[in-house]
Curated annotation (Swiss-Prot):
Interacts with hair keratins. One of its GO terms (cellular component) is intermediate filament. This is Keratin-associated protein 15-1. Belongs to the PMG family. Signal peptide: none annotated. It comes from Capra hircus (Goat). The gene is KRTAP15-1. InterPro entries: KRTAP_PMG (IPR007951). Keywords: Keratin. In the hair cortex, hair keratin intermediate filaments are embedded in an interfilamentous matrix, consisting of hair keratin-associated proteins (KRTAP), which are essential for the formation of a rigid and resistant hair shaft through their extensive disulfide bond cross-linking with abundant cysteine residues of hair keratins. The matrix proteins include the high-sulfur and high-glycine-tyrosine keratins.
Amino acid sequence: MSFNCSTGNFSRSLGGYLGVPVSTCDSFYPSNVVYSPSTFQLGSTLYSDCQENFFRPVSFQTPCAVTRSFQTSCSHPQNFIFRSPCQTIYTGSLGSGNIGLGSFGCGSTGFQSLGCGSNFCSPTYVSSRSCRSSYY
């Protein structure tokens, strides 16, 4: 199983692709999205996958009271399944405390409410998410 971490659709030697959660806000800064290889162990087997890191610029103003939506696309060969959940981790502060962590299951839409208590804020945080796969 091989992954191409240069795109959001990770190529696999057995065909098909692995879709990762995509934030509608991230499309404003596609150059700030970086994919890197990562590995995880399931039992005695070591698997490889990709992790997506999104670096939001300080200058990006966003309404704090909105809800960020993450849609997942989990198309894959039938001999593969996803280990849930796909995990999105926020680090940093929005001026009213840490955002914390949100977990979203594959094949579904997850929502993370920001709610800063003010009309606008300048988020300076890193969003990191990964979707892992394994055999049946």
